[in-house]
UniProtKB/Swiss-Prot annotation:
Its cofactor is Zn(2+). Keywords: Cell inner membrane, Cell membrane, Hydrolase, Membrane, Metal-binding, Metalloprotease, Protease, Transmembrane, Transmembrane helix, Zinc. Pfam families: Peptidase_M48. It comes from Syntrophobacter fumaroxidans (strain DSM 10017 / MPOB). One of its GO terms (molecular function) is zinc ion binding. Binds 1 zinc ion per subunit. It is a multi-pass membrane protein. It is found in: Cell inner membrane. This is Protease HtpX homolog. The chain crosses the membrane at residues 7-26, 30-49, 141-161, 183-203. HAMAP family: Pept_M48_protease_HtpX (MF_00188). CDD domains: M48B_HtpX_like (cd07336). One of its GO terms (biological process) is proteolysis.
């Protein structure tokens, strides 16, 4: 199953989960409200997600005068990928990492931490930037924003189901089998958030493999990205980002939380070893 098809299936599963929860909480009217809520939140995510994440990490525009090598690499890769030149931002963070954001290629941003160019060679930096441009090319930022937003809607509806179970609400409260309806609300409140999280993680992991493959094609050097991933993974374990948020961890090229034991239980990224193996088999 291809990465794009798998992502489509998983997004459809998240949407179906939202509609199902809406039905469990409020019947046909609940299903409609759930759908509208998901739509409204997705529109907001589309327009404002990039501004929010850049502000979260105190990222500032990086001028070409301050980083001519970064700009030269990004310009060359953008031309190779047939993409507009993205804006480049700097994150004041010693842990080496990078991410891309923006609702479309015309509004794309690549953000790199101060620690990135301290430990990587120019070829390895090129591999990282190619990976981030691959996310832009594949519209992964839009996909991940939609997935995160839909997962947020699931959490809201699951909380509604929880309150419905506590206070005897739900569409089955007036039916003969009200106990079954109550049980359905309890099951929904417990399992729906877990299902949403697992689907979101599956989407994120699928898109990382695709970005590795596409980025290696842009740079014509999969080995440079493989070496960069090895260094970044080791640095992330030794020095995880202090201000990294679980809600945005999926944006980074390597998991910024990987040094924290609880974060490894449900990683937003596929195993580094498998990513490196795939790159070196290209």
């Amino acid at each position: 199953m291809g990465s794009r098809f798998r992502t489509t299936v998983l997004l459809a599963a998240l949407t179906a989960l939202i509609i199902w929860i809406g039905g469990a909480v409020g019947g046909s009217h609940g299903m409609m409200i759930a759908f509208v809520l998901a739509l409204v939140m997705n529109v907001g995510s589309y327009w404002f997600s990039d501004k929010i994440v850049l502000a979260m990490y105190r990222a500032q525009p990086l001028s070409e005068a301050d980083a001519p090598q970064i700009y030269r690499i990004v310009r060359e890769l953008s031309a190779s990928a047939n993409l507009p030149m993205p804006r480049v931002y700097l994150i004041p963070e010693s842990a080496p990492n990078a991410f891309a954001t923006g609702r479309n290629p015309e509004n794309a941003v690549i953000a790199v931490t101060e620690g990135l160019w301290r430990i990587l060679t120019p070829d390895e930096i090129r591999g990282v930037l190619a990976h981030e441009l691959a996310h832009v090319k594949n519209r992964d930022i839009l996909v991940s924003s939609i997935a995160a937003t839909l997962a947020g809607v699931v959490m809201i509806l699951a909380r509604m189901a929880q309150w419905g179970a506590l206070f005897g609400g739900g569409r089955s409260s007036s039916d003969e089998d009200s106990g079954g309806g109550m049980l359905g609300l309890v099951v929904t409140a417990i399992l729906a958030p877990i299902a949403a999280m697992l689907i979101q993680l599956a989407i994120s992991r699928s898109r990382e493999y695709l970005a590795d493959e596409t980025g290696a094609a842009f740079s014509h050097n999969p080995e440079s990205l493989a070496r960069a991933l090895e260094k970044l993974a080791m640095a992330s374990h030794q020095n995880p980002m202090e201000d990294a948020s679980p809600s945005t961890a999926h944006l980074f090229i390597v998991n910024p939380l990987s040094g924290r034991s609880l974060a490894n239980l449900f990683s937003t990224h596929p195993p580094i070893e498998e990513r490196i193996r795939r790159l070196r088999s290209m």
